[in-house]
């Protein structure tokens, strides 16, 4: 989604609601900058934002109308003239790689074996008494 510039008309009459509007818009993901003109009540939001979501959230605070939405074009970069590369220094003669001997880790004298994790109880033995009586009383 390209960066957008949205101009919103808000009807704000109190400082408290103005602050809530700023906080609500600033919490939306992708907002780059927020400006507001107190005389006209227009708020300008710039960034990669979902404009209808911002309008829905602001309508819970005050009367909000969407004035315009524009795609912000990135500033054009002027091509810089190429500078001549400085001459490369002569390569240094190859040195043999240093061998570093790391100390061998010995057992810590205060290292204890971990305790067994007996955090459960053994279940009681369940048994069923099944009687296999094949004699029939009715017949």
Swiss-Prot record:
Disulfide bonds: none annotated. A lipid is attached at residue 136 (S-farnesyl cysteine). PROSITE patterns: HMA_2 (PS50846). Induction: Up-regulated by cadmium. GO terms for molecular function: metal ion binding. Residues 137-139 form a propeptide. Keywords: Lipoprotein, Metal-binding, Methylation, Prenylation. This is Heavy metal-associated isoprenylated plant protein 13. It comes from Arabidopsis thaliana (Mouse-ear cress).
